[in-house]
């Protein structure tokens, strides 16, 4: 089983600040996906196949990486971006998820 470790576990960013969330895999993976979850809702697909934005995701989000190291970046934090973000990969026959990164607004 491939283990995904996200960093940081919790972070706070000011509006307009650049934010980067990283996901490290215990073995090389071909594709990494990202989900956004807001309080009381199910996780939504956010970025798929490393860098492709899901429908409706703002262009300030981007994804990158290869091998065992991947990241999600927000170029300029907005209030609506406060959420929990999860990385996820599939390695037959298992889906595995990272533990999540809680992104809050710094006030």
From Swiss-Prot:
Gene Ontology CC entries for this record: immunoglobulin complex
Region described as Framework-1: 1-23
Keywords: Adaptive immunity, Disulfide bond, Immunity, Immunoglobulin
SMART domains: IG (SM00409), IGv (SM00406)
Region (Framework-2): 34-48
Region (Complementarity-determining-2): 49-55
Disulfide bonds: 23-87
Location of the region described as Complementarity-determining-3 in the Swiss-Prot/TrEMBL record: 88-96
Additional comment: This chain was isolated from a myeloma protein that bind galactan.
Protein name: Ig kappa chain V-VI region XRPC 44
Species per Swiss-Prot/TrEMBL record: Mus musculus
